């Protein structure tokens, strides 16, 4: 149920796209994302910083999708998003007391300092690689191939990365702590998946728009 709620904007996006087209669907996704964050705030009286950042990305980049008609911008946008996240994660090593990934997951699991640093750099490498992969496919292959890569390739990379991350983290979790932390870990991973889902939503918006132009 939590994952379904996290994917609420994505589901509405696809429904609106089938019925009314890309621009109405993009507007619906923006409105749905704002409503989603507003609901979380009304329920919990607080919003995580990552939720605010991802909402801002959807509003700004989704708004750009509605206004701009430049195919080059559309194809570069997912790369800019991924590299932007890489910069945020890298910057968190120098601003604040903890890397941002540690702030997200510190209450759920206990890891050595070196493990948190390695985990953070795994995320940074993932975002950089995703950005490079997007540009490579966009410029080396036709638009149809790029759209397929955006819809299926990067989603597959994302799922594989989450699995690798889970295996890495599991090396440091004591079996005696599993039952106590199960619920919290599930909440943290749901939040992480939500963030990735929102980034993938922006990628889907780009892909569908470019496909329509073709």
Curated annotation (Swiss-Prot):
Disulfide bonds: none annotated. The keyword Cell inner membrane applies. Its main location: membrane. Keywords: Cell inner membrane, Cell membrane, Membrane, Transmembrane, Transmembrane helix. It is a multi-pass membrane protein. The chain crosses the membrane at residues 11-31, 50-70, 81-101, 119-139, 149-169. Pfam families: IspA (PF04279). It is found in: Cell inner membrane. The keyword Nuclease does not apply. One of its GO terms (cellular component) is plasma membrane. HAMAP family: YciB (MF_00189). Belongs to the YciB family. Plays a role in cell envelope biogenesis, maintenance of cell envelope integrity and membrane homeostasis. This is Inner membrane-spanning protein YciB.
